[in-house]
Amino acid sequence: LAATVAVLAARAAVLLAALAIDWLVGEPDILWRRVPHPVVLFGRAITFMDKRLNRRRGVTGKSRQARGILAIVILVVLAAMLGWGLSFGGPVVACIILAVLLAARSLDEHIRAVATAMGEGIGAARTAVGMIVGRETKSMKKGDIARAAIETGAENLSDGVIAPALWFLAGGLPGLLAYKMVNTADSMIGYRNAKYRAFGCGAARIDDAMNLIPARLTALLICGAATLNGRGSAALGTMMRDGRHHA
């Protein structure tokens, strides 16, 4: 028990340092224009598996589903092994990797940009929200823009900050990289369309499972933050009402 507490304390210290670095530095564009971001590399690995295993001709739905599960298992194992190897670099390496994979400042900047743009006019607001959502924004009204920004902010707070932090605390760099691989795969192949309904369902289900606790913790944190302006009860009521509609 003492050893477990010591490990968690060490990881918590690394996490706090990484959050501070992320908040101070953010996403340095000059760096990522020269070298690929780790998530980009994960995306390339997922694309490789997609091209090699996601064949629709002459393959049944169950076979494609099995291929998709095999693909995500291989990718997760490789990500965890990479994390295990990087763990030997010590807390400094862990802190740098965690800071790179957290997205607190980037999320804050993008959401604030939408809020600022809403004061400048509907056109600017549509452009700003278009930077963080994949849906069409040309016909959005102010209410739609605010709703889209809030939804995206809540989702990315869970996926980009809370979940990576929890998985790092629980599993160190192997847990962190395994989570980021699954989350990236879900964003790329976890769609309910003809191409990915079968092949991507494994990634989508694993992503749901790995986000089960982080998503609920994120919702509670948002409710806690809402108490600062006296809206805690309303936020909690919304969470209880709408939570069943989400994974």
Over which residues does each language-model region extend?
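Hydrophobic alpha-helical transmembrane segments
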Residues: 1-178, 182, 190-247
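Solvent-exposed interhelical
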Residues: 187
